[in-house]
Design a protein with these regions (language model features):
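Intrinsically disordered, low-complexity sequence elements enriched in Ser/Thr/Gly/Pro
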Residues: 6-7, 24, 92
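Sequence-pattern detector for short linear motifs
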Residues: 11-12, 18, 44
């Protein structure tokens, strides 16, 4: 039966805990899968979505896979954690574009092991590595349009973690989508420098609220909790990323379907089936609602029609968006 080996930030503990899995027998037809979840599995965001996909594929594939997972790892410790996984698994997956640089380095050292990055881009890849692009910027354009449709103040905000091209491009397209609906809308964009910093995310959201923002979007992991705290205190609302909060949390008026879990399942299923291929693979809106889309809680038929039309225009090339 598949099982998780979850390890924390201390690299010594990571290595020690990993060693506990070494004696577990693995059937010849069982795929050993190592997964690096740099954040928390319960962040209500990217990491949780990836974890949900991992648990789903465990249920569907059963004894065909054995999973070893490392979570809550800092950037400085990422390469060593991935090396630990590569030493004992046939497929190693990094959840999040922040794992791509370290994953590339480790993949070069283990040419017989398959590697996949969920949220990868067109950066350097190696012959034994695949990069699955969720196309966040593409989806953010649609989310921005939705935010503009529901904003009562004409001011919306976006908070990103690391100020890197995919996250910056996502913020840019969020603003472009909003302005396609309301050219006069004000879009406030901030980067905290850390996907998991709750205090900085709260501070950035409160600053946006002080300028009139009533709808917030994000690319955050645990940092989302800070945005939630600010929105709850000030009575504003969030369009979430990755996980469905409609009907369970009044702060949320919608969520974007970024498909992190779907891509995690895809990587493992392809490897088990023997159809896994290296290289860059874009997903996004073209791959359907499991991979990318938007769900607005209680949206009217008219709003759904407008958002579907915007998505179609992106797919048809009538609306050009940035990479990311």
């Amino acid at each position: 039966m598949s099982h998780f080996s979850s390890m924390r930030r201390n690299v010594a503990l990571v290595l020690a805990a990993s060693a506990l899995t070494l004696g577990v027998a693995r059937a010849a037809d069982t795929l050993a899968v190592g997964v690096l979840l740099p954040g928390s599995r319960s962040d209500k965001g990217w990491m949780e979505s990836g974890y949900d996909g991992l648990t789903a594929v465990q249920k569907s594939l059963g004894d065909k896979i054995k999973v070893q997972m490392i979570e809550n790892i800092s950037n400085a410790d990422m390469e060593q954690a991935l090396t630990t996984l590569a030493q004992k698994n046939q497929l190693v997956i990094g959840i999040g574009g922040q794992t791509q640089a370290a994953l590339t380095k480790v993949a070069k050292k283990f040419p017989k092991i398959k590697f996949a990055v969920i949220g990868g881009n067109r950066d350097e890849t190696v012959p034994n590595m695949s990069g699955y692009d969720v196309k966040q910027a593409q989806l953010a354009y649609v989310v921005g349009a939705a935010a503009a449709m529901v904003s009562k103040t004409g001011v919306i905000s976006y908070v990103g973690g690391l100020e890197i091209p995919p996250i910056v491009n996502t913020g840019t397209e969020y603003g472009n989508g909003a302005k396609s609906v309301n050219p006069k809308i004000k879009v406030i964009v901030n980067y905290t420098g850390d996907f998991d910093d709750v205090a900085k995310s709260k501070e950035a959201t409160l600053a946006a609220i002080a300028q009139g923002a009533d709808i917030h979007y994000h690319i955050l992991n645990l940092g989302l909790r800070g945005m939630e705290q600010a929105a709850k205190e000030k009575g504003t609302h969030i369009i979430g990323s990755y996980t469905d909060r409609c009907g369970t949390d009044p702060l949320y008026i919608g969520y974007s379907i970024t498909g992190v879990g779907y891509l995690t399942e895809y990587a493992i299923e392809q490897a088990v089936a023997g159809t896994w291929k290296p290289g860059y693979k874009p997903f996004g809106l073209a791959m359907g609602p499991k991979a990318s889309g938007i769900a607005m809680c209680g949206a009217s038929a008219d709003m759904k029609k407008k958002l579907d039309g915007i998505s179609k225009d992106i797919l048809d090339g009538k609306i050009k968006v940035l990479e990311g």
